């Protein structure tokens, strides 16, 4: 595979941004096996965004010859008070995440945060070094990576450690490529600003599109801001453990205004999930409504939807069936005990209240 093909794999949707493409091109020219990571907080049930979309992108990196790592950030999860702030619960749920990513990304390395910190005695001294290059104001601005407001005056001291730890993770893993959803952009920009001053390796940053929730987006949200699929709201997205009928029903109820292409979750799923997995989407409909039609690229489907040649009901039916084909094999192989399921459910109630 030549360098251009590798770059195109990285740029493939759901990728939204590469900082920078020139650096990525040069990296592939000089490094036959660059090191990648994506950090994952261990929180609720895995869904279409947190497992499927993320794994599709990881597998693109693998195809491009990249050495990929899924970093299960157990200590970051504790700092962010997920799963009730119980480290015992976090450790139990981390096994579920480990199993899931090994299943969907079989060629990726899985690293638990605790294991990294136990194996690298210099980690904490490096954490202090990078913290000395971070002002309190900039640290506060990066709190959005945790889903927190940068204006939160009641934030506890522990949460302020989170951004510095994430930056130190990147250095400790000796990474060439850092990968995350767009919500992690601020920490990656901090890394690209601070690491050169410390004479540390500066990685390329790759950010993928966050899948939106299925509900109609709030009108007051600024243009381009995404209400992402939530692990704590059972009605907000497609979860790996939803049955086939639940998947179809959720898609059927999802927001998909006729002719509207902006902030349309069903179109986003078609683009970033369905077309990633399948070369063609076939819309089945009666002859009186135009008969069956197939699309071999998202742009033509989007164009027909915009011109109201493709009705939301028909699009939803096709997307729902496609998702069943994608999710059901994962659901059937990913074991989730009743005990662990109840543990996650109970702690999600706690997370929503705090």
Question: What feature does the model see in each segment?
Answer:
Residues 1-18:
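Short glycine- and acidic-rich boundary segments immediately preceding or forming the N-terminal edge
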Residues 72-85, 208-214:
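Short connector loops at secondary-structure junctions
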Residues 87-207:
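Divalent-metal (Mg2+/Mn2+/Ca2+)-assisted nucleotide/phosphate chemistry catalytic cores
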């Amino acid at each position: 595979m030549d360098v251009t093909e590798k770059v195109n794999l990285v740029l493939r949707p759901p990728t939204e941004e590469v900082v920078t493409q020139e650096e990525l091109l040069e990296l592939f020219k000089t490094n036959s096996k660059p090191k990648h990571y994506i950090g994952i907080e261990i929180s609720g049930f895995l869904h279409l965004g947190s497992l499927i979309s993320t794994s599709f992108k990881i597998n693109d990196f693998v195809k491009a010859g990249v050495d990929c790592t899924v970093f299960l950030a157990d200590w970051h999860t504790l700092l962010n008070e997920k799963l009730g702030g119980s480290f015992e619960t976090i450790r139990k749920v981390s096994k579920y995440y480990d199993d899931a990513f090994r299943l969907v990304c079989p060629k990726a390395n899985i690293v638990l945060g605790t294991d990294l910190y136990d194996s690298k005695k210099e980690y904490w001294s490096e954490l202090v070094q990078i913290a000395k290059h971070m002002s309190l104001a900039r640290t506060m601005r990066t709190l959005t990576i945790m889903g927190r407001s940068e204006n939160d005056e009641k934030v506890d001291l522990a949460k302020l450690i989170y951004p510095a730890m994430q930056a130190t993770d990147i250095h400790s893993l000796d990474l060439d490529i850092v990968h995350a959803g767009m919500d992690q952009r601020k920490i990656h920009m901090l890394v690209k600003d601070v690491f050169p001053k410390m004479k540390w390796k500066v990685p390329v940053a790759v950010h993928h599109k966050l899948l939106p929730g299925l509900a109609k987006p709030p009108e007051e949200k600024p243009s381009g801001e995404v209400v992402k699929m939530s692990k704590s709201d059972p009605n907000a997205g497609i979860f790996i453990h939803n049955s086939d009928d639940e998947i179809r029903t959720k898609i059927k109820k999802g927001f998909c205004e006729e002719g509207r292409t902006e902030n349309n979750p069903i179109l986003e799923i078609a683009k970033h999930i369905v077309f990633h997995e399948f070369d063609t989407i076939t819309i089945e409909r009666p002859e009186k409504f135009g008969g069956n039609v197939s699309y071999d690229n998202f742009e033509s489907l989007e164009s027909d939807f915009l011109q109201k040649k493709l009705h939301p009901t028909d699009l939803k039916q096709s997307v729902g069936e496609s998702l069943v084909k994608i999710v059901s094999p994962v659901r059937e192989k990913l074991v989730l005990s009743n005990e662990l399921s109840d543990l996650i459910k109970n702690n999600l109630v706690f997370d929503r209240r705090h």
